Amino acid sequence: MYFTEITMKNLFYGLLLTLLFTTTPAAAYNSSDLNQLMSSGSCAYGDLSGADLSSLDLTGANLTGSNLTGARLIKTKLAGAVFDKAVLTKTVLTDAELANTSFKAAQLNYTNFSGSDLKTADFTQANAFRAKFANCDLQFAVFYLTNLQEATLDSSNCLEADLTQANLSYAWLYNTNLHEAVLVYANLFNAKMNNANLSNANLTGATLSQALLQNANLNNAMLDKAVLDQTDFKGASMNFTDFGTAFKTEAIFE
């Protein structure tokens, strides 16, 4: 009898654990907020966390202050949408149409924008720690005072983007086009920028200590007052590069 009771208890707890770990969790979003978005195209300060909004046309949507944590917006049309102060932690926005969008002061930690059109998007003061912008069109985008620490921007087009005072420490910018980009007083400590195009870029006062710029294009770039402690420029093209009063302590040029 005693053995049978123990066996039954073990079976019960085993079944309970199985249910706990295999049952699919319910969607976290608020149904009324989702309905509002679907009917009006906007949902400011709503809870849309975990919602799948992929391939929808949400052009110009107002999503100010909304919670979109873990939501999926793959190939979604969002040109001109407003995400100011919204939370998009671990949100997937790959291959989306996001031109002219606003992400001012938004939380974008671990957000995946890979392959998206983000021309003229505004990320002023957004927090985008470890966000992914690989292969994105970021022409004329604004990243003023944006936290992009450990973010990935490999092979993205950042033509004339404004990254003034942005934190790009430990960021990945392999093969990134930063032609005529503004990186004044940006933090690029230990950034990986091999093969990047920084021609005509303004890096005045930028911190590039321990950054990798091997085989990068720095033709006509401005680096006055930049901090270049142990920066690796091996193989870089530097025709008419203006170092001005840059701090070149132990910089590596060959």
PLM regions: where:
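N-terminal signal peptide c-region/cleavage motif recognized by signal peptidases
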Residues: T23-P25
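Extracellular polysaccharide-degrading/modifying enzymes targeting complex plant/algal/animal polysaccharides
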Residues: T18-L20
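Absolute protein N-terminus
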Residues: M8, A28-Y29
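Short, Lys/Arg-enriched N-terminal segments with co-localized hydrophobic residues
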Residues: M1-T7
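Tandem repeat scaffolds
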Residues: Y29-E254
